[in-house]
Structures are given as structure tokens and as C-alpha cells.
Regions:
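Bacterial Sec-exported substrate-binding components of ABC uptake systems
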Residues: 2-74, 181-217, 267, 275, ...
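Short helix-initiation/N-cap motifs at beta->coil->alpha
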Residues: 47-49, 106-121, 251-260
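A short, structured surface patch at a secondary-structure boundary
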Residues: 65, 69-123, 154
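Solvent-exposed, polar/charged alpha-helical surfaces in well-ordered, non-transmembrane soluble domains
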Residues: 70-73, 122-126, 142-145, 169-176, ...
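Extracytoplasmic ligand-binding site segments that recognize negatively charged/polar headgroups
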Residues: 90-93, 139-145, 149-177, 211-234, ...
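Proline-aspartate-enriched helix->loop->beta-strand connector
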Residues: 113, 120-134, 260-273
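Structured C-terminal subdomain patch of bacterial secreted/periplasmic proteins
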Residues: 165-176, 180-182, 189, 270-332
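Alpha-helical, coiled-coil/dimerization segments enriched in small aliphatic residues
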Residues: 227-256
Length: 332
């Protein structure tokens, strides 16, 4: 490959002056016209090390990543999304959420091999959102702030001050943040209780004498870099909750390159493969095509599972569903 891009790590970029001028005459503050909507505001939350203030509950949402969708649906605010861009695999969502997504205009689904969205600044700004979910390379928080648009990112994906020790509590904390932003605290707490019950139920299905090791990998389909997930990722607490020992438990990075030799040396009993979109069989073939892969215990014993990235990363309600998938696949 000509470049090594870590899956779901996003870099910031500056907003050009021309793009700012396009919107200079457009003051988009739909919520401010509704006195009821502004009750209890302004509110300030911390995200990616920055303090972000909302003068009213956001009314025009732009989705640049799929991770926040389940939370927005459960809070009853997904219908405020005016546009979306990127990959929104149907497997992530229930029928009710899919119905809401179908009503949201999709501007583009173009992503590169590592899941990075390809979209222009002008296209996003033209939607006149008051809140964008997800940071991409050419749309940083600061660049959007120049045209009075707020941005929220999942803590693990922050380009600055990322969450380096995510766990299931991180999921609940982010839901409370969304509840505060949208003035939906009761809905957030109800959803948190549901998720806590689901985590407890999954853990109850783990065998008491479970002692297997596991690795979570992100292979590059078609050949190239293979990435692994350490303790700085949600993969680590997810494996622990499923009863497994992460073979990369001594690596504090979230995601990092791993060689075939390293993988063979650690030889996990179970391998979980992550991907952004496409055919799971291609992802598994990318693992099997690695030099020496046929000697891996997980491969020899057919203990390999493939699931979509957001079922593990970042720490969102989808990580709970991913835990359920893992327990269902590997526990008796």
C-alpha cells in the first residue's frame, strides 16, 4: 500500500476563507426562534477537551459517522437530522432506526479503504446544520466554529484529548452528554439502564472457567497493513466482559500495526475481525492470506469471527450489541 492509515482515526484540517464567506450571510439559529426550545439553555459540555456551548437544543443535525445514530434514535432526536454522509451499514440498526435513516438525505457514501469519509467542506456547510456528528479530515471543530456550527465526536475518535481508557461507563457518560445537549436526561437514563441490563445478561452467559485468549484485528482487504487493538480501545473491555484475555493487554495504544510474526508469537485462541463495510468473507480472507496464518490456533480451530467496526469501536451502544455477538458466537 502507498500509505498506512489507521482505521477510524481522523485528522483535522483548516477551513478555507472562501468556504466561510459562502455562509457569512447565513445565520442559522433555528432553535433560537422558539422560546420553549431555549428553556434551560445555554448548556455547556466538554468534548475532546473543548468546552462547547449550546444556546438551544440543536434542530438541524448532520451525520458524518454512524456511531451516534442509535443514541440519537433512543433520545428521540434522530428525525432532526437533515443530511448524512458516509457508511451506514443496515446491520447496525433496528427497523425503526432504519426507517428514520431512510428519511435522511444521504449526500455521499464515498469512503476509502479504511473507512474515511470523502466529502467537501462546502457540501456540509451548505446543509446549514447547527450540530455535526463526527470529525473528518477537512472539517475540524475549529473550522466549523468559524461559521457557528458545533461539532460532537465520540471520545475515542477525538483528534485531541481522546479517551485512552474507554469502557462501558464511557458509553453511559456519552449518553448523558447527549441527554444534556438535547434536554433529554430522562430518556438517556432509561436507555443507560437498558444497556446495563444487557451487559449483565451477556456476562452471565460467560463460562466460569473461561481462560481463552483473543485478539481484535482490522485487516486491509486486498493486502496491506493489519491493525490490532490494545487497551486504549473499546475492544479491550469488550473482550474482558466476554471472559477473554486480550493478547495485546500490554499495549496501551488504541490501534496499531501488527506483523504476521507478532500475531503468530501471541497466537490467540480467538480472533475477531473488524471492517467498515463490504463482504465479511473478504475480511476473513485478508486474515487467511497473511504469511503463516494457517498456523494460528484461531484459524486452525475455526475460531474467527467478523463483525462491523462500530460493534466494537468506539464506545457506543453498538459496543453492547457487539459484546452480545461475541458471547453468542464463542460461549456455550
Amino acid at each position: 500500500v502507498t500509505r498506512a492509515i489507521r482505521p477510524p482515526v481522523y485528522k483535522t484540517g483548516a477551513l478555507g476563507l472562501a468556504a466561510a464567506l459562502i455562509l457569512s450571510a447565513c445565520s442559522n439559529q433555528p432553535a433560537a426562534t422558539d422560546p420553549a426550545a431555549a428553556a434551560g439553555y445555554p448548556v455547556t459540555v466538554e468534548n475532546c477537551g473543548d468546552e462547547i456551548t449550546f444556546d438551544a437544543a440543536p434542530q438541524r443535525l448532520m451525520l458524518l459517522k454512524s456511531a451516534s445514530v442509535p443514541a440519537l434514535h433512543e433520545l428521540g432526536v434522530l428525525d432532526r437530522a437533515v443530511a448524512r454522509a458516509g457508511a451506514f451499514p443496515q446491520a447496525y440498526f433496528d427497523d425503526a432506526t432504519l426507517a428514520e435513516l431512510d428519511d435522511i438525505a444521504q449526500l455521499t457514501s464515498d469512503v476509502d479503504a479504511t473507512g474515511h469519509l470523502q466529502i467537501s467542506r462546502e457540501v456540509v456547510i451548505a446543509q446549514e446544520p447547527d450540530l455535526v456528528f463526527g470529525e473528518v479530515e477537512n472539517l475540524s471543530r475549529n473550522s466549523l466554529a468559524q461559521v457557528d456550527i458545533n461539532l460532537l465526536e465520540e471520545p475515542a475518535f477525538c483528534s485531541t484529548s481522546p479517551d485512552t481508557k474507554p469502557d462501558f461507563e464511557s458509553i453511559y457518560d456519552q449518553l448523558r452528554l447527549y441527554g444534556k445537549v438535547f434536554d433529554k436526561p430522562d430518556e438517556a437514563e432509561t436507555y443507560i439502564t437498558e444497556l446495563q441490563d444487557r451487559v449483565a445478561a451477556a456476562q452471565a452467559d460467560v463460562a466460569e472457567n473461561e481462560n481463552r485468549t483473543a485478539a481484535v484485528l482490522y485487516p486491509t482487504v486486498g493486502g496491506g497493513t493489519t491493525y490490532a487493538y490494545g487497551t486504549g480501545s473499546m475492544a479491550h473491555p469488550q473482550l474482558e466482559a466476554a471472559g477473554f484475555t486480550n493478547v495485546f493487554e500490554n499495549t496501551s495504544e488504541r490501534v496499531f500495526e501488527v506483523s504476521s510474526e507478532q500475531l503468530l508469537g501471541l497466537d490467540p485462541d480467538i480472533i475477531i475481525l473488524l471492517h467498515t463495510d463490504g463482504d465479511p468473507a473478504d475480511v476473513e480472507n485478508a486474515l487467511r492470506d497473511l504469511p503463516g496464518a494457517s498456523d494460528l490456533t484461531a484459524v486452525k480451530n475455526d475460531q474467527v469471527m467478523t463483525q462491523l467496526l462500530n460493534f466494537t469501536e468506539p464506545a457506543t451502544p453498538l459496543s453492547v450489541t457487539g459484546l452480545e455477538h461475541i458471547v453468542e458466537e464463542f460461549q456455550p
